[in-house]
Regions:
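Active-site hotspot residues in diverse enzymes, especially metal/ion-binding acidic/histidine motifs
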Residues: 1-80
Length: 80
């Protein structure tokens, strides 16, 4: 069931927030995105701390890869 939701969710988010930028969508959903320079191999992570949602992204990646990872972590935030 998650795979069907995963294919529908991006279109719904783009329609609702009038953007395909995952950073803008995260901000609209009150999810804080932070870059981390201490990640070794890890590209990103989603965590909830004291009822606050965070996406952590490896600061050493290209901007294109950061967008991809942010979108991926948004999926974790919304589907799990």
């Amino acid at each position: 069931m998650i795979s069907k939701q995963a294919s529908i969710l991006p279109r719904r988010l783009i329609r609702r927030y009038h953007t395909n930028d995952p950073f803008e969508i995260a901000a609209a959903l009150d999810i804080t995105v932070m870059e981390r320079s201490d990640f070794q191999r890890q590209k990103g992570a989603f965590k909830v701390v004291l009822h606050n949602s965070f996406i952590f992204i490896n600061a050493t990646m290209s901007n294109e890869m950061k967008r991809i990872v942010c979108a991926h972590e948004l999926g974790h935030a919304l589907l799990h």
